[in-house]
């Protein structure tokens, strides 16, 4: 929470919670099909592959950490009524999962009527009937009751539900397709799911395959694959890294590590419908991103405040040794000087150390931006700068991401941001910066009653540190997944008072983290 007095904070409007949740929940598909895209006859599956049934159970039941569901967290399976009825009674509802059945007429009581009477009350806790199609189910799963308690939503059939999944508005929320390909043709099939669909607007990438193997039951050959929609936005980042490493020039730098560098690039990321561009080809430290951005917004300059939260991204630049090397011998250890947050909230004020009270001192650029957006959204001077030439020598590190310009689309009521970053560490810094300015744009949009629009990231000296080359080559081999969603579980009276725990990133399916050393 901000130390500032209330009159110096930015009050949040009554509309602050309007876009706290997405319109529809992201989801995945689990399906098995033969060589003619057949999935069944409407009542049963015309092949026997026990390994696929085991995969289905594990994939839809276990959480992403491969642990079983808990009272607070489980997955959901969405199915049509015929698919529900095709499940043997003894397995209804599917254990350990929230079963969402799409039906215009059935009730929970009717669906559970075939069960022994003594089991119905407990089973009712695991079944929800949605009067509508897949979109209505995803709308329900995007609401507060389920957004945090459901980790992954799986669409499991039948044919009409799969067909709906491949059409708007559902297709925009489809993150993964787990497909078991049966290397045979079942003449009994009367229901089909062509995947990948021909002439589809969405391109699909094969993310993984367990390899073609033979079932121990009937000897059928099968292959379990995972497909993901092509993430063109993350590919911008990967392609830029590849271009830097192939065509950039080798340069020495102040850290002594050395870089491969090129000058001038740009990437664009959509923030619409709660989308958060948190890179997936490696796990990005979201907690660090969020806490640092809130630290900026509060005008704080003590790295110790972050270290106390076990966030050590500024420790190197706040060390006694580093401060002394910058000539900042009078700064207390971990006092970074008038860096980002100070310039955002107190531009031009005389810096007297991180412990001083700066209420009302300098230019509060963030507050000015919020007020101007609300009163004059067409203003072309909606800029925030951290680059103060008069204060650079007092900073532990001059700002790398130094200028943000905001833009209001008055036709769509969307707020977009263009970030200019002079020095761009592609391996460590840039993934952080993308997510950080996405969050800043989302919060400013909340404070001004607008929807988040787009983040445009303009890079000056875009470079790869030489000691990051091998790690980045490994990252380039990975297939990007869909970006996650940011939700707000709690709201605050003032912009500066939002906390990490008020937000949650859901449907984030990244590859493992990749260790890279920070050049100090």
Curated annotation (Swiss-Prot):
<dbReference type="GO" id="GO:0004799">
    <property type="term" value="F:thymidylate synthase activity"/>
</dbReference>
<comment type="function">
    <text>Bifunctional enzyme. Involved in de novo dTMP biosynthesis. Key enzyme in folate metabolism. Catalyzes an essential reaction for de novo glycine and purine synthesis, DNA precursor synthesis, and for the conversion of dUMP to dTMP.</text>
</comment>
<feature type="binding site">
    <location>
        <position position="180"/>
    </location>
    <ligand>
        <name>substrate</name>
    </ligand>
</feature>
<dbReference type="GO" id="GO:0006730">
    <property type="term" value="P:one-carbon metabolic process"/>
</dbReference>
<dbReference type="InterPro" id="IPR001796">
    <property type="entry name" value="DHFR_dom"/>
</dbReference>
<keyword id="KW-0489">Methyltransferase</keyword>
<keyword id="KW-0554">One-carbon metabolism</keyword>
<feature type="region of interest" description="Thymidylate synthase">
    <location>
        <begin position="234"/>
        <end position="520"/>
    </location>
</feature>
<dbReference type="GO" id="GO:0005737">
    <property type="term" value="C:cytoplasm"/>
</dbReference>
<protein>
    <recommendedName>
        <fullName>Bifunctional dihydrofolate reductase-thymidylate synthase</fullName>
        <ecNumber>1.5.1.3</ecNumber>
        <ecNumber>2.1.1.45</ecNumber>
    </recommendedName>
</protein>
<feature type="binding site">
    <location>
        <begin position="38"/>
        <end position="44"/>
    </location>
    <ligand>
        <name>NADP(+)</name>
    </ligand>
</feature>
<feature type="binding site">
    <location>
        <begin position="421"/>
        <end position="425"/>
    </location>
    <ligand>
        <name>dUMP</name>
    </ligand>
</feature>
<keyword id="KW-0511">Multifunctional enzyme</keyword>
<dbReference type="GO" id="GO:0004146">
    <property type="term" value="F:dihydrofolate reductase activity"/>
</dbReference>
<feature type="binding site">
    <location>
        <begin position="81"/>
        <end position="83"/>
    </location>
    <ligand>
        <name>NADP(+)</name>
    </ligand>
</feature>
<feature type="binding site">
    <location>
        <position position="30"/>
    </location>
    <ligand>
        <name>substrate</name>
    </ligand>
</feature>
<dbReference type="InterPro" id="IPR012262">
    <property type="entry name" value="DHFR-TS"/>
</dbReference>
<keyword id="KW-0560">Oxidoreductase</keyword>
<dbReference type="Pfam" id="PF00303">
    <property type="entry name" value="Thymidylat_synt"/>
</dbReference>
<keyword id="KW-0545">Nucleotide biosynthesis</keyword>
<keyword id="KW-0521">NADP</keyword>
<keyword id="KW-0808">Transferase</keyword>
<comment type="similarity">
    <text>In the N-terminal section; belongs to the dihydrofolate reductase family.</text>
</comment>
<feature type="binding site">
    <location>
        <begin position="463"/>
        <end position="465"/>
    </location>
    <ligand>
        <name>dUMP</name>
    </ligand>
</feature>
<feature type="domain" description="DHFR">
    <location>
        <begin position="26"/>
        <end position="229"/>
    </location>
</feature>
<dbReference type="InterPro" id="IPR020940">
    <property type="entry name" value="Thymidylate_synthase_AS"/>
</dbReference>
<feature type="binding site">
    <location>
        <position position="254"/>
    </location>
    <ligand>
        <name>dUMP</name>
    </ligand>
</feature>
<dbReference type="InterPro" id="IPR024072">
    <property type="entry name" value="DHFR-like_dom_sf"/>
</dbReference>
<dbReference type="GO" id="GO:0006231">
    <property type="term" value="P:dTMP biosynthetic process"/>
</dbReference>
<feature type="binding site">
    <location>
        <position position="401"/>
    </location>
    <ligand>
        <name>dUMP</name>
    </ligand>
</feature>
<dbReference type="GO" id="GO:0005829">
    <property type="term" value="C:cytosol"/>
</dbReference>
<dbReference type="GO" id="GO:0046654">
    <property type="term" value="P:tetrahydrofolate biosynthetic process"/>
</dbReference>
<feature type="binding site">
    <location>
        <position position="162"/>
    </location>
    <ligand>
        <name>substrate</name>
    </ligand>
</feature>
<dbReference type="Pfam" id="PF00186">
    <property type="entry name" value="DHFR_1"/>
</dbReference>
<feature type="binding site">
    <location>
        <begin position="102"/>
        <end position="105"/>
    </location>
    <ligand>
        <name>NADP(+)</name>
    </ligand>
</feature>
<feature type="binding site">
    <location>
        <position position="433"/>
    </location>
    <ligand>
        <name>dUMP</name>
    </ligand>
</feature>
<feature type="binding site">
    <location>
        <position position="52"/>
    </location>
    <ligand>
        <name>substrate</name>
    </ligand>
</feature>
<dbReference type="InterPro" id="IPR017925">
    <property type="entry name" value="DHFR_CS"/>
</dbReference>
<feature type="binding site">
    <location>
        <begin position="157"/>
        <end position="164"/>
    </location>
    <ligand>
        <name>NADP(+)</name>
    </ligand>
</feature>
<feature type="binding site">
    <location>
        <position position="32"/>
    </location>
    <ligand>
        <name>NADP(+)</name>
    </ligand>
</feature>
<dbReference type="InterPro" id="IPR000398">
    <property type="entry name" value="Thymidylate_synthase"/>
</dbReference>
<dbReference type="GO" id="GO:0005739">
    <property type="term" value="C:mitochondrion"/>
</dbReference>
């Amino acid at each position: 929470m901000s130390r500032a007095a209330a009159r110096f904070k930015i009050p949040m409007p009554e509309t602050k919670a309007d876009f706290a949740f997405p319109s529809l929940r992201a989801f995945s598909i689990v399906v098995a099909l033969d060589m003619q895209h057949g999935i069944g006859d409407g009542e049963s599956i015309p092949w026997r592959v026990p390994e696929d049934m085991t995969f289905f159970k594990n994939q839809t039941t276990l959480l992403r950490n491969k642990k079983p569901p808990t009272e607070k967290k489980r997955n959901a399976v969405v199915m049509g009524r015929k698919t529900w009825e095709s499940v043997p009674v003894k397995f209804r509802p599917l254990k350990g999962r929230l079963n969402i059945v799409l039906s215009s007429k059935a009730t929970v009581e009717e669906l559970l009527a075939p069960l022994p009477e003594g089991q119905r009350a407990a089973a009712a806790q695991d079944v929800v009937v949605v009067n509508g199609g897949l979109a209505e189910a995803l709308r329900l799963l995007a609401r507060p009751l389920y957004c945090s308690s459901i980790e992954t939503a799986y669409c499991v059939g039948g044919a009409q539900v799969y067909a709906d999944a491949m059409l708007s508005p559902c297709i925009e929320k489809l993150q993964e397709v787990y497909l078991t390909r049966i290397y045979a043709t079942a003449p009994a099939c009367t229901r089909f799911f062509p995947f990948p669909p021909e002439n589809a607007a969405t391109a699909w990438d094969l993310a993984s395959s367990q390899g073609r193997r033979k079932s121990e039951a009937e000897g059928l050959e099968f292959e379990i694959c995972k497909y993901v929609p092509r993430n063109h936005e993350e590919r911008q980042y990967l392609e830029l890294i590849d271009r830097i490493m192939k065509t950039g020039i080798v340069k020495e730098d102040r850290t002594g590590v050395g870089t491969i560098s090129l000058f001038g690039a740009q990437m664009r990321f959509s923030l619409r419908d709660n989308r958060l561009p948190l890179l997936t080809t490696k796990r990005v430290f979201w907690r660090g991103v969020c806490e640092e951005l809130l630290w900026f917004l509060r005008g704080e300059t003590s790295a110790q405040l972050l270290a106390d939260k076990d966030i050590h991204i500024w420790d190197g630049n706040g060390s006694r040794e580093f401060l002394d090397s910058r000539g900042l011998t009078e700064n207390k250890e971990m006092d970074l000087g008038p860096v980002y947050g100070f310039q955002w909230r107190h531009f031009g004020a005389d810096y007297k150390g991180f412990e001083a009270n700066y209420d009302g001192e300098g230019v509060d650029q963030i507050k000015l931006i919020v007020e101007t957006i609300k009163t004059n959204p067409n203003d072309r001077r909606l800029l925030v700068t951290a680059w103060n030439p008069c204060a650079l020598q007092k900073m532990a590190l001059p700002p790398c991401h130094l200028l943000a310009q905001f833009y209001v689309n008055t036709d769509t009521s969307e707020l977009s941001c263009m970030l200019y970053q002079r020095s761009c560490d592609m391996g460590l810094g840039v993934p952080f910066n993308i997510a950080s300015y996405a969050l800043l744009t989302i919060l400013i949009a909340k404070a001004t009653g607008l929807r988040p629009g787009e983040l445009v990231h303009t890079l000056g000296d875009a470079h790869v540190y030489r000691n990051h080359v091998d790690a980045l080559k490994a990252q380039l081999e990975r297939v990007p997944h869909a970006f996650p969603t940011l939700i707000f579980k709690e709201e605050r009276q003032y912009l500066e008072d939002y906390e990490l725990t008020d937000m949650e990133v859901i449907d984030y399916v990244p590859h493992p983290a990749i260790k890279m050393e920070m050049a100090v």
